[in-house]
């Protein structure tokens, strides 16, 4: 549960002094961070999660300090210009004592996925920063059970045909969602039960189809798919938990109630339309057209040569976001943004294409024995909003080309 957050100043509390590493349970991790949920008895940390950065030998202390400043500026000042604070979680930056930090990471190593264990170097220098976040899976309501769904919706739009290169890609990329292309490329399915275009459509029936498809993918994958996660009473559950009757609510009744909660919450929220606009407006000409602009400016260099794409600074990022919010559709005009601005915009669009929605509500056991949603308890937050390295654009372009070409080779023009 990363930090799409409303930032709070770095003052007390101090997890290293106030808690034991064993008070924190592993939740999940991404490429650069691990997230923990507080399981101890302190009211100060109740309903809190802790996100820590993995130590890496490849990051120099000075570069890490600059990166910390950039990420801090992004959380505190820049991100809230793009997403309203009611969609962001609150957060507080904390400094962790080195021995406590290392003990925390060593303690959870046994439960971490094997594919995530490489790249951590406990000898790496640098400060040990963490971010205290809202634990959106937990509940302080007596007598009510917190239920939550985490959705990673992915790309909610199709690119404009006039900007697609080469011509062979047009019939594919303008009709087949990026999610379907990627699923087919990975060997999963060319017709998955879930399509983001349905979820982002705003049409109730299509949105219901999307949610049913996400349930299906979750069940088929035995809960391993990262597009749909289910939490009950602060714990992530699996399809086995549901099928084996390990929940306080019956399986069929639970699925029905949570699907309706999710659908109603998303329909009354502006989260999906806003994310779609950010995805599309920050990626207005498709990466294939952006690659053509790069090649025109640097004809003797590889596409998106990382040596020609310096890291973005906090000042530069803030400046571009101000340009963007002054005219969000400006990128559709080829004479508006510079190449550098378009690359920054694309890196920002990648954040909103890969973020997650967290829908939460509370169920209470009524006197008639039926579990009912507590009125007004539903909410939606946007999480997993970390900045992505701007140099990743070379990898993104390569992936884009691979997925549509594989579809063409295996399925034809559409």
Curated annotation (Swiss-Prot):
Family annotation (Gene3D superfamilies): Inositol-pentakisphosphate 2-kinase, N-lobe
InterPro entries: Ins_P5_2-kin, IP5_2-K_N_lobe
GO CC list: nucleus
Enzyme Commission no: 2.7.1.158
Gene Ontology MF terms: ATP binding; inositol-1,3,4,5,6-pentakisphosphate 2-kinase activity
Keyword Kinase: yes
Sorted UniProt keywords: ATP-binding, Kinase, Nucleotide-binding, Transferase
Motif EXKPK motif in this chain: 150-154
Catalytic activity field: 1D-myo-inositol 1,3,4,5,6-pentakisphosphate + ATP = 1D-myo-inositol hexakisphosphate + ADP + H(+)
Keyword Ubl conjugation among UniProt keywords: no
GO biological process, alphabetically ordered: inositol phosphate biosynthetic process
Recorded superkingdom: Eukaryota
Free-text note regarding domains: The EXKPK motif is conserved in inositol-pentakisphosphate 2-kinases of both family 1 and 2.
Role this protein plays: Phosphorylates Ins(1,3,4,5,6)P5 at position 2 to form Ins(1,2,3,4,5,6)P6 (InsP6 or phytate).
UniProt record similarity statement: Belongs to the IPK1 type 2 family.
Protein name: Inositol-pentakisphosphate 2-kinase
Source organism per UniProt: Cryptococcus neoformans var. neoformans serotype D (strain JEC21 / ATCC MYA-565)
Upper taxonomic lineage: Eukaryota, Fungi, Dikarya, Basidiomycota, Agaricomycotina
Protein's gene: IPK1
């Amino acid at each position: 549960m990363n930090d799409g957050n409303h930032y709070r100043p770095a003052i007390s509390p101090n997890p290293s002094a106030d808690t034991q590493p064993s008070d924190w349970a592993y939740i999940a991790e991404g490429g650069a961070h691990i997230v923990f949920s507080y399981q101890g008895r302190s009211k100060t940390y109740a309903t809190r999660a802790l996100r820590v950065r993995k130590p890496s030998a490849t990051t120099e202390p000075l570069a890490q300090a600059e990166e910390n400043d950039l990420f801090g500026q992004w959380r505190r000042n820049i991100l809230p210009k793009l997403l309203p604070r009611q969609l962001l979680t609150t957060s507080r930056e904390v400094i962790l004592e080195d021995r406590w930090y290392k003990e925390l990471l060593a303690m959870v190593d046994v439960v971490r996925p094997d594919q995530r264990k490489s790249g951590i170097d406990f000898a790496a220098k640098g400060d040990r920063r963490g971010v205290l976040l809202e634990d959106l899976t937990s509940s302080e309501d007596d007598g009510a059970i917190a239920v939550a769904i985490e959705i990673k919706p992915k790309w909610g739009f199709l690119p404009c045909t006039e900007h697609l290169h080469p011509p062979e890609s047009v019939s594919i990329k303008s009709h087949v969602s990026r999610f379907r292309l990627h699923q087919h490329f990975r060997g999963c399915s060319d017709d998955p039960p879930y399509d983001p275009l349905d979820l982002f459509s705003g049409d109730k029936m299509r949105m219901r189809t999307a949610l049913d498809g996400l349930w299906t993918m979750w069940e088929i994958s035995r809960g391993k798919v990262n597009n749909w996660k289910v939490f009950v009473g602060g714990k992530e559950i699996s399809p086995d938990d549901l099928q084996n009757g390990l929940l306080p609510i019956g399986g069929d009744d639970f699925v029905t109630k949570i699907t309706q909660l999710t659908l109603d919450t998303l329909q009354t929220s502006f989260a999906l339309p806003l994310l779609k606009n950010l995805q599309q407006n920050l990626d207005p000409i498709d990466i294939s057209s952006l690659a053509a602009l790069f090649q025109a400016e640097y004809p003797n260099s590889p596409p998106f040569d990382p040596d020609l794409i310096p890291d973005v600074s906090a000042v530069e990022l803030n400046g571009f976001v101000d340009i963007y919010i002054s005219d969000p559709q400006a990128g559709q005009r080829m004479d508006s943004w510079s190449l550098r601005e378009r690359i920054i915009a694309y890196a920002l669009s990648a954040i909103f294409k890969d973020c997650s929605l967290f829908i939460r509500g509370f169920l209470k056991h009524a006197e008639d024995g039926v579990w009912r949603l507590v009125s007004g308890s539903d909410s939606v937050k946007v999480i997993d909003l970390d900045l992505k390295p701007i140099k990743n654009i070379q990898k993104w372009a390569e992936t884009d080309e691979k997925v549509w070409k594989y579809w063409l080779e295996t399925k034809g023009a559409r």
